[in-house]
Amino acid sequence: MPVRCRRPTMADFKQILLQMLRQLKDKGVQPVLMTLPPIDAQRYLDFLCREGRSRERILDWLGDTQRIYRHQELYSDTVARLAYETGTPLIGVREMFLDEKRLPKLIAADGIHMTMEGY
């Protein structure tokens, strides 16, 4: 029987990130946070389904294709909010990508990673 791991909740994520920031600052290190680069949810779904995986079952589990994007955006927004709340410098990577007219060329075929041009 496969072992199931408990996924961290958003509260867990915030707590862990805050703890890391405190530990770094306590050691005299100035942390810098960055927002997450955007993903292309449709490309990611296509990538997941490329080897015969059931698109219907994946969408049944997700609810809709864009849920992947929204979930990742929530984490990015949380990082930005915590940076503001803790006075931690923030690099707005997501915003830089979203401002790009050539955004599709910056995201790889898997929908998650950047192309060489994106890096």
Tell where the protein language model's regions lie, with residue ranges:
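Alpha-helical cap/lid subdomain in secreted, periplasmic
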Residues: 1-117
